[in-house]
Amino acid sequence: MEFEHRPVLLEPTVDALVLPDFGGKGAHRQAGEPGPDAATRLQHGVFVDGTFGRGGHSRALLARLGAQARLVVFDKDPQAIAVARELAAGDGRVEVVHGGFATMAEELTARGIEQVDGVMLDLGVSSPQIDDAERGFSFMRDGPLDMRMDTTRGPTVADWLAQASVDEMREVIADYGEERFAFQVAKAIAACRATRPLHTTLQLAECVAGAVRTREKGQHPATRTFQALRIYINRELEELARALASALDLLGPGGRLAVISFHSLEDRMVKQCIAAAARPAAAHARLPLRESELPQPLVRSLGKVVADDVEVAGNARARSAILRVAERTGEPLPPGGGAGFVKAGRVPGEPVRGTRAGSKGRRR
């Protein structure tokens, strides 16, 4: 079954990678300041789409690249990879990797690529994944409680909920869903699974709905819990941290990073990474160093873009989207590389911290 997918912020994302004078709100480039040599980059550059999905952003970028350019696309989703391979079969510039963007550095190195001209990431869940009940992402459609981006490996949400403690569930839901009723939700899930296994999305949604005492306007009470479980089961924030670090390591001078995020946890990580790399001297402000001894910016922020009213009217998913863009300077990488500018989340497999006395989920 085919599901429609409309890429969010399509034109500004591609513009961010190819236009030398691109600048969104808050861009640090001054008017008239020259950008990178766009003609050379478009004809011979190497670009990365870390979240191929159904290929909307990739196709739009390919339409503006030259015949000698290369585009390496990544995705965990087997259905997305099938679409990507069809595209690659008809366009020799495209190379396909079945894997997440966290493996970007290793996969590019294996292909002899040491430097790239652009990296784009469209974070979150695609419309086809949400609309397909069998994937288990939606609390509005009944389906298996799965939520894996890559359905060929790893535990499902149902697997994890069947064995997680109340404390583990509480912390995941509080940290990754920013749910203030996380403790109540965790206890409700434990009570529900004691009477019958939780195998479907609607079972979980009904269980959670009874524990969330107030509703945010226009938001289903299970929204934050589903978000938290999806992020946790796919290790989304840990993988984003690795991808951002790899992008800083791989981008050549003038290369661009364009990231679309859909919730505050992702956007905060992207924003903080760009800010840290653009203003590394801030971390040394209290040290008795001469200006010449301070670290120089690794990137220049090119600002952010949000969807206009026209796009939001035609695609509700665009309402929460934020595109942030950065341009690599010619400054050499510091010891430790790009990882030093990224605040990583939970390490995959790290034990969940226990509940503090009296804690019932934290407000954020």
Curated annotation (Swiss-Prot):
Region listing for Disordered, in residue ranges: 333-364
UniProt-annotated binding residues for S-adenosyl-L-methionine: 55-57, 75, 101, 122, 129
Keywords, in A-Z order: Cytoplasm, Methyltransferase, rRNA processing, S-adenosyl-L-methionine, Transferase
Known catalytic reactions: cytidine(1402) in 16S rRNA + S-adenosyl-L-methionine = N(4)-methylcytidine(1402) in 16S rRNA + S-adenosyl-L-homocysteine + H(+)
PANTHER family reported in the protein's UniProt record: 12S RRNA N4-METHYLCYTIDINE METHYLTRANSFERASE, S-ADENOSYL-METHYLTRANSFERASE MRAW
HAMAP family: 16SrRNA_methyltr_H
The protein, known as: Ribosomal RNA small subunit methyltransferase H
